[in-house]
């Protein structure tokens, strides 16, 4: 008997791109078209169940075996690095981690900098690799105002188009790393569900063609 696969993903852009990818793989995803306020969806043939959750919670659902598969940005995985297997770079949801600040910021200044961010692990690791001792200020909301009001010398944040930075008088000084959506899986599920391995191989063949993945 075929076992159902549960997939946890973030509502919004990643969800939409994941649905498109599954459609290209030949799966009927029409049941996801009219979601309303629902957060749990099951395919008509019962082969898939989808959970729409907040991005940081995707790893939690996969880690505890509630979901067999998770689709989430690499930014989340860097901050929550354990308890799952990272299987595939899905080649969508592309953006980057960058250091940004007001135009008078000097990245070569060796004074102890204050860095505001929602991603303390990313920021700390980046500056440690540069041999710089920095003070990390964790902020949960919009970080763009931190350099403007003097709370921090610079910020580490996700940059896609850069429009939000420009609108707040900031510019990018350093790029840290590329970010994209990744597929993660539960370790026990990979061992106990042959359907999961077959699904991963199917996705791997599809995302290997970047033109197909981005079309």
From Swiss-Prot:
One of its GO terms (cellular component) is cytoplasm. It is an enzyme of class 2 (transferase). It is found in: Cytoplasm. Signal peptide: none annotated. It comes from the Bacteria. Its main location: cytoplasm. Coiled coil: none annotated. It catalyses: 1-(5-phospho-beta-D-ribosyl)-ATP + diphosphate = 5-phospho-alpha-D-ribose 1-diphosphate + ATP. Keywords: Amino-acid biosynthesis, ATP-binding, Cytoplasm, Glycosyltransferase, Histidine biosynthesis, Nucleotide-binding, Transferase. Pathway: Amino-acid biosynthesis; L-histidine biosynthesis; L-histidine from 5-phospho-alpha-D-ribose 1-diphosphate: step 1/9. One of its GO terms (biological process) is L-histidine biosynthetic process. One of its GO terms (molecular function) is ATP binding. The keyword Cell inner membrane does not apply. Its EC number is 2.4.2.17. Catalyzes the condensation of ATP and 5-phosphoribose 1-diphosphate to form N'-(5'-phosphoribosyl)-ATP (PR-ATP). Has a crucial role in the pathway because the rate of histidine biosynthesis seems to be controlled primarily by regulation of HisG enzymatic activity. Lacks the C-terminal regulatory region which is replaced by HisZ. Heteromultimer composed of HisG and HisZ subunits. Belongs to the ATP phosphoribosyltransferase family. Short subfamily. This is ATP phosphoribosyltransferase. The gene is hisG.
